[in-house]
From Swiss-Prot:
Record's keyword terms, sorted: Membrane, Transmembrane, Transmembrane helix
One of the record's GO cellular component terms: membrane
UniProt keyword Amino-acid biosynthesis, yes or no: no
One Pfam family cited in the UniProt record for this chain: VAS1_LD
Keyword Oxidoreductase assigned: no
Transmembrane segments: 147-167
Cellular localisation: Membrane
Name of the featured protein: V-type proton ATPase subunit S1-like protein
Family: Belongs to the vacuolar ATPase subunit S1 family.
Protein encoded by which gene: ATP6AP1L
Length: 224
């Protein structure tokens, strides 16, 4: 397996036209090593301009080719590498590895693409609306909902739920502690004793009234 990493300079590459790509496509070529040597390694980025919305045109990286000895050695199909046509695309890491979010997928053809592992660090590219040979405002890949972003969001929500549950339990335990202190206090016992005494007096008073009522209802019998 060939492992290849490159720190791409933030420069707008020269544009070459190819009739096979169509009117809305361009390819940018980056050569490593001696530019005049046909055996030197070259990377070709094929970009396509399209209208995602009626009021805004976008460009996307459609294909990445690794060329050596004037022949294509590997082909990768990018996913999620796009930006408005008036912007450049920028990402900290773009590659074929899972740690790079697998933005470069090896081609399905049997050309040995799966044997290559490619990673671009500090990657930035723009193929349209170039002014003065400089990048325009960049759209970062971090703004999209990447798997790492979604995992971080899910972990944050789980942590928030755990903290909310812990706070609820803390408040409940504090309430139980206050109730226990209230029950165990001498004032509470004196109140209970006074209430029990009052209930006993009320019970005795009601029993005496019932006895008097029964005596008053006795009937006298006279025999002649």
């Amino acid at each position: 397996m060939r492992l290849w990493k490159a720190r791409v300079l933030k420069l707008v590459l020269k544009t070459a036209k190819d009739s096979r790509l169509g009117l809305n496509s361009k390819w940018l070529s980056l050569k490593l090593g001696d530019a005049g040597n046909p055996r030197s390694l070259a990377i070709r980025f094929i970009l396509t301009n399209y209208n995602k919305l009626s009021i805004q045109s976008w460009f996307s990286l459609r294909r990445v080719e690794i060329i050596s000895n004037n022949s294509i050695q590997a082909v990768f199909n990018p996913t999620g590498v796009y930006a408005p046509s008036g912007y450049s695309y920028r990402c900290q890491r773009v590659g074929s590895l899972q740690q790079d979010q697998a933005l470069l997928l090896p081609s399905d053809t049997d050309d040995g693409s799966s044997l290559w592992e490619v990673t671009f660090i500090d990657f930035q590219i723009q193929g349209f609306a170039i002014k003065g040979g400089r990048f325009t405002k960049a759209q970062d890949c971090a703004s999209s909902f990447s798997p790492a972003f979604l995992i971080g969001l899910a972990m944050s929500l789980i942590l928030l739920l755990v903290l909310a549950y812990a706070l609820h339990m803390l408040i409940y335990l504090r309430y139980l502690d206050q109730q226990y202190d209230l029950i165990a206090s001498p004032a509470h016992f004196s109140q209970l004793k006074a209430r029990d005494t009052a209930e006993e007096k009320e019970l005795l008073r009601s029993q005496g009234a019932e006895c008097y009522k029964l005596r008053s209802q006795q009937i006298s019998k006279i025999y002649v």
